[in-house]
Design a protein with these regions (language model features):
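N-terminal ligand-binding/catalytic initiation module
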Residues: 2-174
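A glycine-rich, Thr/Ser-enriched phosphate-binding loop motif common to dinucleotide/cofactor-binding enzymes
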Residues: 179-192
Length: 192
């Protein structure tokens, strides 16, 4: 499926929701917890791996050709790896909407939900990452080290004022877009 077809599909799919309804469905605890068992997202392969030929294309020796091409021209990384459609959703769990400072483990489920929204409505792969630190330097260093695996960084539910310093430092240091969801997302929704 082409990128433009995916974008049209996600827009069309979004319109199937009743936008006039402001009510949530009534849910039982069993229904909620059973649906969330083992998490809400999964990573799947875009390629078939049904034969030796498939394996040769997806991994060795075929992968070496792509690696060499990217090594010669690093701009190809977004065309031939998942980085072009991949967003890191990063939180320390210190400012989760409606829940406050619940820590990284409890916040992970919210980040999984954000990943679902990115996939369903924008066609992007969101990767939830929760970090067990509130130290801005540690957050910054960790995000800088993992940034080459992603096409963008989405900062989520990190308490102020640390979130503003972290965002500013990342924008100045890494070469991919950085979105501070609690700041930019609110501004986008407010102006929409």
């Amino acid at each position: 499926m082409s990128d433009s077809h995916e974008a049209e599909s996600t827009t069309r799919d979004f319109s199937s929701f009743n936008s006039t309804s402001r009510e949530f469905a009534e849910l039982t605890d069993a229904e909620v917890f059973n649906s969330h068992l083992c998490g809400k997202i999964a990573t799947t392969s875009k390629l078939n791996l049904d034969s030796v030929r498939d394996l040769s294309i997806a991994y060795t020796p075929g992968v070496a050709r792509v690696c060499e091409a990217i090594h010669e021209d690093p701009s190809l990384v977004h065309d031939y790896t998942w980085t072009g459609r991949n967003v890191a959703i990063i939180s320390d769990g210190t400012a989760v909407l409606g829940l406050g400072d619940i820590g990284p483990q409890a916040a992970l489920h919210v980040m999984e939900g954000k990943a679902q929204l990115f996939q369903r409505f924008v066609g992007l792969n969101g990767v939830p990452i929760v970090l067990d630190t509130t130290n801005v330097d540690e957050l910054f260093d960790t995000i800088c080290h993992i940034a080459p695996s992603f096409g963008a960084i989405n900062l989520e539910d990190i308490s102020a004022p640390r979130c503003f310093e972290l965002e500013r430092r990342l924008i100045d240091h890494i070469n991919i877009p950085v979105m501070h969801d609690d700041q930019h997302g609110t501004a986008i929704v407010t102006t929409a």
